[in-house]
Amino acid sequence: FLTMALAIFILSCENDGGTSNIPLNDGAAPNLIKSASTYGFFNLIRLNNGENVSIDFYAEVAQGNPAKTDIVGSYKTAGGLVYNTTLFGDVTLPQDFSLSINDIITVFSEINVASDIEVGDVLTITTRFTMNDGTVLNILNENGTSAVSSNIQTTVLFDSVISYPVSCPSDLGGTYNVV
């Protein structure tokens, strides 16, 4: 029995890495950071008062060596519609970026005026990388859901996606008694 087991073991290792080898491609992942100097959301009160509300963020390559990088946005309305566009095409990272409401109205053809922006809408920002071999790596699917595995989504090493909800902040200042 030992001789037969040894023979099978030796023969099975003879072609190790041959036809059973699964090729792995190198990928890339972004790191996106919201700026501390601007809101982490779109302030609908300021927007309704006619202000050109803006957001700032920083983007860098966390992993990999992409040949081309686009900063892309996915805008999901409170009603469930999803709009996708390239916010900044063929950029060099690392870099700081800024987007105003007027910029968003310009790049998303489905959003015509500032009043189209409502509470519950969310702008999600990430990257689309093109690798040297032509492979395109999308972090988001066309419907705005994640196109990457949970280990990329939940890593503590970098943020591959940042989201800016549309919100109405409230001032609940005062004195409260906790019982």
Positions of PLM-derived features:
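Acidic/polar, low-complexity intrinsically disordered N-terminal segments immediately downstream
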Residues: 14-178
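Sec-dependent signal peptide recognition
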Residues: 1-3
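C-terminal motif of bacterial Sec signal peptides marking the signal peptidase cleavage site
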Residues: 9-12
